[in-house]
Amino acid sequence: MDGRKQRQRGMGHSLLRLMANKGIVPFDTYPDSTHDQLPLPQWVFMLGARYTPQEFAHSVCGPEEYMAVTSDPTQPYGKMIVADYPDNWERETFLNVPQDSLVAIVLRALHHRHPVCWEGDINNSGFSFRSGIADHTTSSRPDDDHCMTIIGLARHPDGRLFFKMKNSWGTDNPYGGMVYMSQEYLRCCTVALYLTREAYLGK
C-alpha cells in the first residue's frame, strides 16, 4: 500500500471476509474461551440443523448484505471512496457522506431496530471506559483503533443525545460495560459505520 508496511490489523470488512471464507460457530460450541489446542469442530448444530462453520456463517451474515460508510471532507460526498487508513490495507471502498449524515444514518437504523457497527477513535481525552462516557474531544482526524456496536439511544439531563454502545471490555463500569457516546463525539471520531443495506435504507 503505497510503500507502507502492511498492518496486521484490519477493519470491519476484514471480519466479514474472514467469516465468509473461514466460517463462524455459535458461542456455546466451545466449552472454554481458549480452545486452539483441541481439534476444531467440523459441524455446528443450531436449532436442530447441522452446518459447517462456513454454512453457519452464511446463514446468519452474508457479506453482500452489508455496506460501509465513512466521512472524508477531502473526497467527494455521495461517492464510493477508498478510505485512507493504514488498517484499510485491503483497499475496501466506503460510501462517503457528510458528518451530519453519519448521525442521521445511525438514527434511521436504530429507529428500524437495526444495530450499527461503529469503528473509530477512542485514544483521546473524551473517551473513558471507566466512566462509561465518550463525550467532548478535540480530535482533528480520527484514528482507527476500536469497534463497538451501537444498540440504542439515551438523553442526557441537559437534553443532548447519546448513543448506547455495546463494548467488549467486560462489565466493570457504571453501565455494566456499556459506553454512552455523544452525537458530537460520533461526528468527530467516527472512522466508519458498517450496517446492513436494509438498515441504511430504513427498512
Task: Name each model-derived stretch.
Residues 36-203:
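Active-site signature of cysteine proteases
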Residues 1-56:
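Papain-like cysteine protease catalytic cores
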